Amino acid sequence: MSIWKIINAIPIVLIRLYRTFLSPLLGPSCKYVPTCSSYALEAFERHNFFYALWLTIWRILRCNPFSKGGYDPVPPLQGTQQSSSHHQESSHHG
């Protein structure tokens, strides 16, 4: 396992803990599909730590009362196409 996989594992574990314990208490609040936590999880699973962190921060900043929300997938890796499997996610873990 590379050092970057280990580094990416830290936010992945934190996001999963948030989704398991905190998100159910807060209720659905994300305007986007996938939800912000799903987006962040996918970003860290797909991209390097720094790019995933940037994508996650930028997404959270855009998830505000003034945004319309909607479908906003994680960008694919360079040279690949976006999978449609995450588009149909109906989870409301924000």
UniProtKB/Swiss-Prot annotation:
Pfam families: YidD. Its main location: membrane. The keyword Cell inner membrane applies. Keywords: Cell inner membrane, Cell membrane, Membrane. Residues 72-94 are annotated as: Disordered. It is found in: Cell inner membrane. One of its GO terms (cellular component) is plasma membrane. It is a peripheral membrane protein. It comes from the Bacteria. InterPro entries: Membr_insert_effic_factor_YidD. PANTHER family: MEMBRANE PROTEIN INSERTION EFFICIENCY FACTOR-RELATED. Belongs to the UPF0161 family. HAMAP family: UPF0161_YidD. Could be involved in insertion of integral membrane proteins into the membrane. This is Putative membrane protein insertion efficiency factor.
